[in-house]
Amino acid sequence: MLNYVIKRLLGLIPTLFIVSVLVFLFVHMLPGDPARLIAGLEADAQVIELVRQQLGLDQPLYHQFWHYISNAVQGDFGLSMVSRRPVADEIASRFMPTLWLTITSMVWAVIFGMAAGIIAAVWRNRWPDRLSMTIAVSGISFPAFALGMLLIQVFSVELGWLPTVGADSWQHYILPSLTLGAAVAAVMARFTRASFVDVLSEDYMRTARAKGVSETWVVLKHGLRNAMIPVVTMMGLQFGFLLGGSIVVEKVFNWPGLGRLLVDSVEMRDYPVIQAEILLFSLEFILINLVVDVLYAAINPAIRYK
């Protein structure tokens, strides 16, 4: 297992290099001139050219790329074109709000999603199954931005129960986490149901029932453990989705996280911040997939990696 983990970690190097190249080319293909945006619409050509020189945008593209890669290897992603602060500091100040929002959303989504999926599988083709799957389909179909605005209108504007802006207290996490985790809970419910339906029809489940084991114990001990392997895969993918896909939710709730920082950076063509954030999201996805593979072996000892 240790050798497998080491090989996967070494595989990060070429993957992140390819991502770095693609991201660099992508951001430089975006329409718009960062120097003009930073200098202002009323700036003349001389001022804009001066800003371009200060930002290093007057240099050849290959020179900019080499400067970016050589510094990134050392952990230096440069300065933000807008704030003139180190990119690492910009990301660090926004990382924890996004991480806590993601964890909060994931916790409730997994608990409710798996519970709904198990109930739907145990009472298959009956009203609990139909009700759970109807709610799940609605959660998948409803756009996150529309759900966010609906929750704001009901619980903040009309009832005045919850705040909408900021991340200062636990109340600020309720509406964004509900919005962000709704689709994940729906996906988890459908995926858990499908996995449990397959497991419940296995021979060892019938054997456990024939031995007089209670249905609750059969489901929790024998069913849950064997149904968890595909569910863990989905959990890992959804966690990565939440980390990188919170852009819309953070924009709706004006959340001080990485998603809003990325949107603001794209609007201002802040190349260093865009490049660093996308690279960070890629690294998160790779590491999450590695953790999922390790959890496979923990859940099912029959799985071994070489």
Curated annotation (Swiss-Prot):
The keyword Transmembrane helix applies. Pfam families: BPD_transp_1, BPD_transp_1_N. Residues 95-292 form the ABC transmembrane type-1 domain. The chain crosses the membrane at residues 9-29, 103-123, 135-155, 169-189, 229-249, 278-298. InterPro entries: BPD_transp_1_N, MetI-like, MetI-like_sf. Keywords: Cell inner membrane, Cell membrane, Membrane, Transmembrane, Transmembrane helix, Transport. Residues 1-8, 124-134, 190-228, 299-306 are cytoplasmic. SUPFAM superfamilies: MetI-like. It is a multi-pass membrane protein. GO terms for biological process: transmembrane transport. Disulfide bonds: none annotated. The keyword Cell membrane applies. Gene3D superfamilies: MetI-like. Residues 30-102, 156-168, 250-277 are periplasmic. It comes from the Bacteria. It is found in: Cell inner membrane. GO terms for cellular component: plasma membrane. The complex is composed of two ATP-binding proteins (GsiA), two transmembrane proteins (GsiC and GsiD) and a solute-binding protein (GsiB). Belongs to the binding-protein-dependent transport system permease family. PANTHER family: DIPEPTIDE TRANSPORT SYSTEM PERMEASE PROTEIN DPPB-RELATED, GLUTATHIONE TRANSPORT SYSTEM PERMEASE PROTEIN GSIC. Part of the ABC transporter complex GsiABCD involved in glutathione import. Probably responsible for the translocation of the substrate across the membrane. This is Glutathione transport system permease protein GsiC. The gene is gsiC.
